[in-house]
């Protein structure tokens, strides 16, 4: 809702075998008004509840079991784990608001709903946030991306940041590609990438280390990194 089709088409180009279908719904009623001044005063306009509720009803098409996700800075943080959860659902409805926000009654009167947030910052409208959620979810659906292995190895797929990437040429301004990547030894490369993933996460996002379920070998690597962060 409230998002044009073009951004959806540009974020993930679906191949012919993909089973994803997205559709936007018009929330404006026949007079074209969907917002009004807030009760109690204050700046800006508030999206009215009734047009939103009617659009949700239209999108559900009689199936009240379809979950509705309201994009809101008050919602639970959207992350890779949540994206994976949404990608496994047959259908979802995403509601993005504009102006100062959405009449609370639209949320209160919607069964089977959840509020989600893409971060602690403010956007001019929810369309961008909606596109972010759709892109993160769609690429996890089998067949959407050409290489499913790339999804498995990406940052956050296992709760950690990804390892650094390199490509040709092997030297740029005096900086060489790590020699291990040129060795052809796939087991050693895999081990190096695992260590670099742990190092990246520990240095850049230590909060993720606390949330990750590390095995004994990974914990030892973290201990080594603590003793020698370079």
Where are these regions (language model features)?
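Internal, active-site/partner-interface "lid" segment
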Residues: 128, 140-180
